[in-house]
A protein has these predicted regions:
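Active-site-adjacent structural elements that line small-molecule/cofactor binding pockets in enzymes
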Residues: 1-142
Length: 142
């Protein structure tokens, strides 16, 4: 697809892309802290998407270090579960990463992700009520 979007021939056939589509959309690769896809996301694609749902803080740290070491530019962590009404407990670095805790702790945990170098975060929220979304936004300090 990337070759087609650049108006290059693929298997001996050239399809002229419309001028407004040349270059195509950004392509981001989603993977855990893998040895294959993270370097490819950094060198061949427009970004990498890590999953907070099935990762530990240690794995998120390992993945972003690998991605940046290969020259990766845009890194997103997605599926970060948020529940600001959940009891606040310890979250060991080798345990599942989440923001299921009080607001202050969620802000601290989120800051750790930002400090690792992730450019964007996508949260999974319990509902889409204005009050909930305002509280979630407070995690980011915006």
């Amino acid at each position: 697809m990337q070759k087609i979007w650049r108006n290059e021939a693929v298997n001996g056939t050239k399809i002229d892309a419309w001028p407004t589509t040349i270059g195509g959309p950004p392509i981001l690769i989603g993977s855990w802290a893998g040895k294959t896809w993270i370097p490819r996301a950094a060198t061949e694609f427009d970004g990498w998407i890590a999953s907070g749902a099935r990762s530990t803080f240690d794995k998120l740290k390992e993945g972003i270090a690998n991605y940046r070491a290969h020259g990766g530019k845009r890194a997103i962590v997605t599926n970060i579960k948020v529940d600001l009404d959940a009891p606040t407990g310890d979250m060991p670095d080798d345990g599942p990463f989440n923001l299921c805790c009080d607001l202050k702790t969620a802000q601290e945990r989120f800051r750790r992700i930002v400090d690792l170098g992730y450019d964007e975060a996508i949260f999974v929220v319990p509902d889409h009520k204005t009050e909930t979304l305002d509280r979630v936004l407070a995690i980011t300090g915006k």
